[in-house]
């Protein structure tokens, strides 16, 4: 078999898998294993501060709400027609973490230049054992193998992205240990999310109305004030910090005099919060538009069988 026909076969298989996943049907354990091996090769080559070109559509938390991710693609455009940047938290809380994260990883393997998937604080072994992804893998596959395959892959996800050298995108927020983007570029990200330190802060911190650094009520990361954002943006020649990590009722929320924006893309979070979701479209001229959306219509949702702790991340 020639190289071209092998590539054609792989592409055909991936297209079939994406089509299956779009119907919210999980792949087999073996397919997940092979897919994640391919994804690892792609992600290994990406930077801790992954450069992204505009136009791009920036998205926040999804949390296993598969039907709302499908709605997001209906509203924002299919990948690869639209270039996407997701800022983490694909799993936990929602009922379809397996299908959600598998679809995003499959799109990454199929269209590596058209989708960027960053790591959120939930892309971690410890957090997923408490908030649903581990249990869901056990229920859908009969063992923890798929959970292990994905949590091993999460170690390779880039931590941050930089759109056109001006918009800094990440899941959580800033760190007192990080002054420059080069500081981030220089650390080894291939590990479980630590309990403290710069890598932890990027995935856990939140903007705050108070100046300076504060102790985070989350027990990880810090709160950071407008003075911190302004200094970081100035030092690194940035126009905006885009982040996710916090439920905001309108789907987006400006802070720090429009130096920081929070984007949240899981509508009616946990199927009960009543919030809108949004995505941020950055055009060729670096202008930006928020698109808000409501939950996708649902049929036959499963009832919650076991209450997960009410701890909003």
From Swiss-Prot:
Q: Which Pfam families match?
A: Metallophos (PF00149)
Co-factor requirement? Mn(2+)
Spell out the molecular function terms from Gene Ontology.
metal ion binding; protein serine/threonine phosphatase activity
**InterPro entries on file:** Calcineurin-like_PHP_ApaH, Metallo-depent_PP-like, PPA2-like, Ser/Thr-sp_prot-phosphatase
Q: Where does Mn(2+) 2 bind?
A: 89, 121, 171, 245
Q: Which domain of life is it from?
A: Eukaryota
Q: Reaction catalysed?
A: O-phospho-L-seryl-[protein] + H2O = L-seryl-[protein] + phosphate; O-phospho-L-threonyl-[protein] + H2O = L-threonyl-[protein] + phosphate
Q: Which positions are catalytic residues?
A: 122 (proton donor)
State whether keyword Metal-binding applies. Answer: yes
Q: Which terms are listed as keywords in the entry?
A: Cell cycle, Hydrolase, Manganese, Metal-binding, Protein phosphatase
**Residues annotated to bind Mn(2+) 1:** 61, 63, 89
| Enzyme class per UniProt | hydrolase
Known EC number(s)? Answer: 3.1.3.16
Per UniProt, the cofactor note for this protein states: Binds 2 manganese ions per subunit.
Tissue distribution is: Predominantly expressed in stems, moderate in roots, nodes, leaves and flower buds.
Known role = May play a role in cell cycle regulation.
Q: Which PANTHER family match?
A: SERINE/THREONINE-PROTEIN PHOSPHATASE PP2A-RELATED
Q: Give the family this protein belongs to, as stated in its UniProt record.
A: Belongs to the PPP phosphatase family. PP-2A subfamily.
The name this protein goes by in its record: Serine/threonine-protein phosphatase PP2A catalytic subunit
The gene coding this protein: PP2A
């Amino acid at each position: 078999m020639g190289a071209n026909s092998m590539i054609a076969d792989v592409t055909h298989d991936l297209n079939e898998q994406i089509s299956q996943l779009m119907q919210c049907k999980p792949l087999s354990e073996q397919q997940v294993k092979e897919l994640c091996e391919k994804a690892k090769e792609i992600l290994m080559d990406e930077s801790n501060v992954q450069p992204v070109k505009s136009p791009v559509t920036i998205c926040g938390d999804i949390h296993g709400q598969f039907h709302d991710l499908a709605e997001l693609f209906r509203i924002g455009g299919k990948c690869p027609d639209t270039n996407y940047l997701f800022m983490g938290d694909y799993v936990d809380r929602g009922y379809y973490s397996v299908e959600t994260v598998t679809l995003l990883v499959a799109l990454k393997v199929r269209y590596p230049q058209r989708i960027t998937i960053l790591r959120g604080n939930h892309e971690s072994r410890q957090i997923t054992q408490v908030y649903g992804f581990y249990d869901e893998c056990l229920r859908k596959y009969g063992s923890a193998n798929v959970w292990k395959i994905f949590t091993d892959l999460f170690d390779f996800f880039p931590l941050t992205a930089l759109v056109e050298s001006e918009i800094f995108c990440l899941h959580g927020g800033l760190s007192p240990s990080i002054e420059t983007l080069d500081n981030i570029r220089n650390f080894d990200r291939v590990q479980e999310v630590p309990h403290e330190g710069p890598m932890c802060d990027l995935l856990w911190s939140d903007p705050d109305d108070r100046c300076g650094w504060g102790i985070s009520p989350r027990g990880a990361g810090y709160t950071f004030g407008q003075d911190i954002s302004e200094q970081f943006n100035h030092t690194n020649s940035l126009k905006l910090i885009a982040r996710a990590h916090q439920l905001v009722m309108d789907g987006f929320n400006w802070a720090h005099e429009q130096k920081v924006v929070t984007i949240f893309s899981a509508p009616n979070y946990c199927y009960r919060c009543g919030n809108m979701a949004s995505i941020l479209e950055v055009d060729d001229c670096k202008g930006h538009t928020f698109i808000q959306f409501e939950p996708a219509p649902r049929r036959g949702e499963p009832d919650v069988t076991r209450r997960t702790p009410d701890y909003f991340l």
